[in-house]
Amino acid sequence: MKEKTKKPRYNLGQNMLWMLRQAHAAHRDDVPVFAVIKALAMAGTGISGLLLAPEIVRCVEDGAGFSRILATIAVLAGVLLVCSAVSAYLEHAPMFARVDVRLALVRKIHYKTCVMSYPLSEDPEVLKLQEQAVRATMNNRCASEAFWVDEQKFLTAALSFVVYLLLLTNTSAWLLAALTVTTAAEYFVNRRINEWGYRHRDEAAALEKKMDYVSDKAQSTVLGKDIRIFGMRPWLEAVYDKTLRAFDAFVERRERVYFWTNVIDAALTAVRNGLAYYFLLRQTLAGGMGAGDFLLCFSAVGAYAEQLNGVLAELGTLRRQSLDLCVIREYLELPEPFRMEGGKPLP
């Protein structure tokens, strides 16, 4: 039987704006600001480190004096030091601000649970959605908090990618075309594969709920006497083990699907790097580059491929986290069957 797929209600851009509104509502507007500053600092660290050696070689090649070489080293090393210091400081400083935003969402979920009407509170689909929303806000690794970290990583990769692309514009139009084609192919293939978890989230939630139910009942002090008297321990263990095996099979299916994402990434990265090195070496042997330009472009090719993979990887991560945010939004925005306010008081 063909499984029915469910399209996400909100896209990544809509969820980004929604998270910005949540940060503002929690009086934590500094969270996105910290993310942008750290992205700029980390991008500056990589770019200044990349430019340091080629600029020194270029100064020597141009016959520059010692003072100019020393000034070049001082400027680039200073930028590298400042950007590294800012990145190190912002590694842990914004953590509590991100926690505040996540806890604000937790409070909204709890409030929704407490005030929803009885028909919704007894609806199995609503209860399943509630459980998924709670799981999406359980810890620091959940989308409600990790979204900011991965958004910063995406901004870092995107900024670095643009700079390295500008550095390679003087190489070959065919090279840039090949990079664009392989990038587009990788993005659209991975986009389809990475949505597998969202399309099967109901199946995973059902298995997790069953395991939690059996575990809670087995640890219940109220039912402990009946479990011992009627010898129910082997039966409970059998039910739990059966459900655990089913969940392991589900995880194995998921990882097999995600494995092909890594295979496609590796294949397209090999093609992309091979083409880049071929065009770069051919242009160098034809005499179109000096020593400094060759070193700069040679370093930029590796950094370009790395940041391109970073953009794609973080975009895939953000899309998966966006799917988790869709679950939270769907639960918080459930329409009530009754009008909960605005009525007239009873006489």
Identify what each model region corresponds to.
Residues M1, K344-P347:
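ABC-type nucleotide-binding domain
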Residues M1-T45, F66-A71, L90, D123-V162, ...:
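Membrane-integrated ABC transporters
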Residues M1-Q22, A88-R98, R107-V126, G197-A206, ...:
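Membrane-proximal cytosolic tails and large cytosolic loops of membrane proteins
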Residues P32-Y89, L165-G197, V271-Y278, R282-G292:
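Transmembrane helix-loop-helix hairpins at lipid-water interfaces of multipass membrane proteins
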Residues A25, D29, V134-F147, R199-A206, ...:
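An intracellular "coupling" helix at the cytosolic face of ABC transporter transmembrane type-1 domains
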Residues G49, A53, V82-E122, I193-G197, ...:
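Juxtamembrane helix-loop junctions of ABC transporter transmembrane domains
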Residues M232, A276, L295-E333:
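Cytosolic ends of transmembrane helices, especially the final helix of ABC transmembrane type-1 domains
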